[in-house]
Amino acid sequence: MARFQRVKETDGDGTSRLVSLEVTDDAVYRTSKAQMWEGRLPLAALISTNISRDGSSDLVTVETKHGQIQWVLKNGQSLIDAIERSRG
């Protein structure tokens, strides 16, 4: 299980929020304490992941069966590696 704190998330609807990510064996849990919000992204719903630079941070773009999610964080490659390890 890998955790990533202070991640800026933008979903397919254009909604942005500050979240914590937790990668488990079957899903990525996305939690925003400030907005009292939690989301679960099943790893089976992931189609592709891509990483690019956004200033001094990494921009991780995830294509899912339900749309696109973008995460901005300092260590994007570690997030992608954790997702790939969990997917097997």
Ranges and model annotations:
Residues 2-3, 9-13, 23, 29, ...:
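Acidic, Ser/Thr- and proline-rich intrinsically disordered linker/docking segments
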Residues 19-21:
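His/acidic/aromatic-lined binding-pocket segments of jelly-roll/cupin-type domains
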